[in-house]
Regions:
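Anion-binding and metal-coordination hotspots
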Residues: 5-6, 70-82, 93-530
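Basic, short loop/linker segments at the boundary and entry of helix-turn-helix/winged-helix-like folds
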Residues: 22-64, 69
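Intrinsic disorder/low-complexity signature
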Residues: 1-4, 35-37, 256
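Short arginine-rich
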Residues: 88-92
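Short, solvent-exposed coil/turn linker segments
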Residues: 18-22, 35-36, 40, 153, ...
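An anion-engaging/catalytic patch
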Residues: 85
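Hydrophobic alpha-helical membrane-insertion signals
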Residues: 1-30
């Protein structure tokens, strides 16, 4: 806000607008108070053990109401308290909140904010707004606050570290020749320790001359050059090892936000598949309300189902049906659902292409061959047996895939060109398959093919994808304004609570509170007459 009295001797007048009149609450404010007024805020504490000046309930109202109005930064929230009538009524006229107070509240109460989110979901259930039968999951990638070109790649760091160790070994040999270090062959496996000792010996003996002239026409002494290069290489090695320790199973990170991972985004401003530092956000939705959320560094969605299901386990009720798109079609997702006795309505990866005639008539696919469970082999169209030959591991699946091969009869087969795609280079038919995964895929395909399965698929697109669209378009949340996974997740949970509040406000205006949302597909006239 501009300061209009900065260069003026006559100061601007201040008027007190807190007159004696009442303002009717909007539906958003009614929904906000309904959801968060009687929750348990005892988990919020202070570092010094004394009661804070501002109640956590009021601070949560500020965060959520600010997010509903597109204000997420601490300075914007500070101005929001001063300018908004509802916030004036919540905090009073004599309370001033500094932006640092808001920032500290978010940083120190990350677990408590997640607990308030869980309590608000239970409050929605008590209002009759949740169906408690079907849960939908989907994910998105949201860009981090980190710079786009602050990448650190794991493979490049490992190569540079090997080169750095080689240079350190060379410097260590120079130190040994100058009688500054005494080493054996075993010391060259970890050369940084004896080289650091050599640098300390140079400093202790006073051999380093920091006032030595530099520039054109001046040559550094051997000791000065050795020490400067050693300090430089040791600092590089320390930084490279620090980066590798922070990878934690990832292949990249950002220097300015080490929790962010570089991913390929749909919002590509250069239209060339550029990688950006981002977080993988997952939402679980029931009746158009976000009931659980998680954050991870996974670049794909197939390993994130377990995180959401663990969050759903904390709710006092259990879901019987789980629905997700083909990005979650993996054996781990099915196994996690079977542990919890949840029916899996996961769209198979070949759902769309399986409807085509060419896919169903492809004789080279394992699904179109006959499997003999007794002999553990497949029978192709020519009647030849493809027997088990071994296992093959992959990054995507925790369990290895089974490899089947046909060792005779493929060269002279009349169907060779249709069965083997690369028939000019490959002599025999060979494919990989996960029988357990394939069996679960068939069950999910049958469930989704029913009339109820069609409704579940339609509701998945409407509900969970609609919530992401609302958060990105209505709230403008396309890039986080905080650093670190914990702080970013707190910011996201506040946005989720604001989304649920806006949805409840719309339901209050429509007079539909107590009837969970479910889109039903209208029957065709032929089905109605039948």
């Amino acid at each position: 806000m501009s300061n209009n009295t900065l260069n003026s001797l006559r100061k601007q007048l201040t008027f007190d607008f807190m007159l004696d009149f009442t303002v009717e609450l909007t539906s958003e404010e009614v929904a906000l108070l309904t959801l968060f007024e009687n929750l348990d805020y005892s988990g919020f504490g202070t570092r010094l053990g004394r009661k804070g000046k501002i109640e956590p309930f009021r601070m949560m109202l500020l965060l959520i109401h600010g997010a509903m109005n597109g204000r997420t930064s601490s300075r914007e929230l500070e101005r929001h308290v001063e300018r908004d009538l509802f916030m004036k009524a919540v905090f009073g006229t004599d309370v001033h909140i500094d932006h640092s107070t808001i920032s500290r509240f978010i940083s120190r109460n990350q677990e408590q904010i997640e607990d308030i989110f869980r309590q608000s979901v239970e409050k929605l259930a008590s209002l009759g707004e949740l169906g408690k039968k079907v849960v939908f999951q989907d994910g998105t990638k949201i860009e981090s606050r980190a710079g786009r070109y602050t990448f650190v790649w794991k493979s490049a760091t490992e190569k540079n570290m090997e080169k750095c160790l080689s240079r350190i070994r060379s410097l260590l040999r120079e130190a040994v020749d100058a009688d500054l270090a005494q080493t054996d062959e075993a010391s060259f496996k970890e050369p940084e320790k004896p080289l650091a000792s050599a640098v300390s010996a140079i400093d202790e003996k006073g051999l380093f001359n920091p006032s030595e002239k530099k520039g054109r026409g001046h040559h550094k002494s051997r000791i000065n050059r050795l020490r400067e290069k050693a300090v430089e290489e040791l600092s590089k090695l320390e930084m490279q090892r620090k980066h590798l320790s922070m990878m934690d199973g990832r292949n990249s990170l950002s220097r300015t936000d080490t929790d962010a991972t570089f991913m390929r985004m749909k919002e590509d401003h250069m239209h060339n598949g550029q990688l950006k530092p981002a977080y993988n956000i997952q939402n679980a939705v029931d009746s158009n309300y976000i009931i659980a959320s998680s954050i991870s560094s996974d670049r794909a969605d197939y390993r994130t189902a377990g995180h959401i299901l663990a969050k759903l386990d904390k709710l006092p009720w259990k879901y019987g049906i789980y629905c997700a798109d083909s990005g979650y079609d993996c054996l781990e997702s099915f196994q996690e659902l079977e542990k919890r006795e949840i029916e899996a309505y996961i769209k198979p990866q070949d759902w769309e292409i399986s409807k085509t005639r060419s896919y169903r008539s492809d004789i080279g696919r394992s699904a179109n061959m006959t499997y003999v469970e007794k002999d553990d082999c497949f029978i192709c169209k020519n009647g030849k047996r493809l027997t088990f030959s071994g296992l093959r591991t992959s990054r995507r699946n925790s369990r290895p895939a089974r490899v089947y091969e046909c060792h005779r009869g493929c060269i002279s087969c009349q169907h060779r060109q249709q069965c083997i795609k690369n028939h000019r280079k490959v002599r025999y038919k060979r494919f990989e398959v996960q029988l357990e995964h394939q069996k679960r895929q068939r069950i999910a395909h049958e469930l989704l093919s029913t009339s109820f399965g069609a409704e579940v698929r339609a509701n998945r697109s409407i509900q969970v994808e609609g919530r992401f669209a609302f958060q990105k378009q209505q709230f403008g949340l396309r890039r986080f304004s905080s650093f670190g996974k914990a702080r970013v997740f707190s910011e996201w949970l506040v946005c989720c609570m604001a989304t649920n509040t806006a949805q409840l406000a719309a339901r209050i205006e429509q007079g539909k509170v107590g009837t969970p949302f479910w889109y039903r597909i209208k029957a065709s006239p032929a089905e109605e007459t039948a």
